[in-house]
Amino acid sequence: MIPKKCALCGKTKYRHVPGVGNPKAKLMLIGEAPGPQEDKLGKPFVGPAGQFLNKQLAAVGIDRKDVWITNVVKHRCIGPPDDKIIGKSLPLLKKEIKSIKPNLIVLLGDTAVKAVVDKNYSVSKDHGKIIKSGKFSYFVVHHPSAARRFKRIRKIFLSDFNKLATLSRALG
C-alpha cells in the first residue's frame, strides 16, 4: 500500500522504501532518496542507478547480498530533498546505522555525505577518502546515477570503487 503522506514530513504521496540487505553487513551503502523504480518496487537501488551500482559491486568482488543498502530519505522526492526533509529523515537513518553496525559506510553522493557526516564535506573534494566521524568510518564516492551519466565522474567512481574493493577485503 502506498501511503498518502510520509509519516516523517507529511509531504509525499510516495511509499516508504526501507533499507535492504544483510542485517549483519560489514559494509553499508547510503544514497540520497528512492527514484521512480524504487518507489514502484519498494526497494532501494533497483532502477538504472541501482543496476549500474550492482554491476560495479560485482566488478570489484562485492556481492550485493552481503551489504546493506539504504537512502538518507526513505521516500521519493521530486528533485533533491531539502534540508527539512533530510532533517526529519536523519533519526530513522541513524537508528538504521546503529542497528546494522557496519564497519564501513559508503556514502553515495553529496546528499549522503552532507547529511550523514557534515555539510562542509563534498563528493567533489572528498571522494575516495575515508572520513572518521563518531563511532563510524565513511568512504565517499559519487552517486551511481551521476557516474552512469557523466564519463568524467564514471572514471572517478570506478577508481574509487577499486579502493573500496581493497577496503572491503580488509573487513573480512
Label each PLM-derived region with a short phrase.
Residues 1-48, 59, 134, 168, ...:
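Active-site and ligand/interface coordination hotspots across diverse enzymes
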Residues 44-52, 86-87:
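Glycine-rich anion/phosphate-binding loops
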Residues 54-62:
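A short, N-terminal amphipathic alpha-helix
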Residues 33-34, 71-73:
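Short, small-residue-rich loop/turn micro-motifs
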Residues 16-20, 57-58, 95-96, 128-129:
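Short, flexible, glycine/charge-rich loop motifs used to bind or transfer phosphoryl groups or to couple energy/partner
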Residues 11, 64-65, 72-172:
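Glycine/proline-rich loop-helix segments at beta-alpha junctions forming the active-site rim
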